[in-house]
Amino acid sequence: MDIEAYFERIGYKNSVNKLDLATLTEVLQHQMRAVPFENLNMHCGEAMHLDLQDIFDHIVRKKRGGWCLQVNHLLYWALTKMGFETTMLGGYVYITPVSKYSSEMVHLLVQVTISDRKYIVDSAYGGSYQMWEPLELTSGKDQPQVPAIFLLTEENGTWYLDQIRREQYVPNEEFVNSDLLEKNKYRKIYSFTLEPRVIEDFEYVNSYLQTSPASVFVSTSFCSLQTSEGVHCLVGSTFTSRRFSYKDDVDLVEFKYVNEEEIEDVLKTAFGISLERKFVPKHGELVFTI
């Protein structure tokens, strides 16, 4: 696997020698704006693989995206290859409808240590929950970013990532009450510990998320990509475009239904994706917010 091919894929052309926070931030931002958070393979009759070579070929060679177990695995590899001090971590996603964290470790994230300071790096949570900068691993400190204010807190060895969100304006009244809209201003995102993980720790959940009727990834197709101003999302056949802070403390969220003839063009123009197999959009009853 060629790190230069990875840099070309994400459009990164700056220093690879300075292992500092600025470089880490740039790599994160280039990847999150080039590599979609998506599960389209599952809705094209294909599997989501964990093998790093498969992930590299899928994302770098075929210019696709993936979910956290793939996208953050690739980021972990790239940062390690560059020489950063990295640790793979596992997270438990907050499930809003039942007000609790997942019982299974379903999220992969990365810890990076720079000059004895630890940071959380995650390029694969998607939608308006995606961090745009590494988060300093410190408890109880508001960390304002473009998407929202992020907050890490620690309790008895468990860390919690939360988000304080802005108001949102939806100009099309048809979608004002859409179930895709996040209704909470204060949003819990996930919990994690600092126990080092390896990719094999995620083998069971990688299979479970692709097969269980209880998995939102089975019931819903999604694709999400950060932009310079916000984020694009395609959930089932509904396309949304969010512009962060389009006016003071308000996000603009625009909706559009995409018909079958438009899907291919939307995937190409908004997400840079060209599929090899027929895609069947799906939006089930399980809650999925943007």
Curated annotation (Swiss-Prot):
Disulfide bonds: none annotated. Keywords: Acetylation, Acyltransferase, Cytoplasm, Transferase. Its main location: cytoplasm. Its EC number is 2.3.1.5. It catalyses: an arylamine + acetyl-CoA = an N-acetylarylamine + CoA. Substrate binds at V106, H107. GO terms for molecular function: arylamine N-acetyltransferase activity. One of its GO terms (cellular component) is cytoplasm. InterPro entries: Arylamine_N-AcTrfase (IPR001447), Arylamine_NAT_domain_sf (IPR053710), Papain-like_cys_pep_sf (IPR038765). It is found in: Cytoplasm. The modification N-acetylmethionine is found at M1. Belongs to the arylamine N-acetyltransferase family. Participates in the detoxification of a plethora of hydrazine and arylamine drugs. Isoniazid, 2-aminofluorene and anisidine are preferred substrates for NAT-1. No activity with p-aminobenzoic acid (PABA) nor SMZ. This is Arylamine N-acetyltransferase 1.
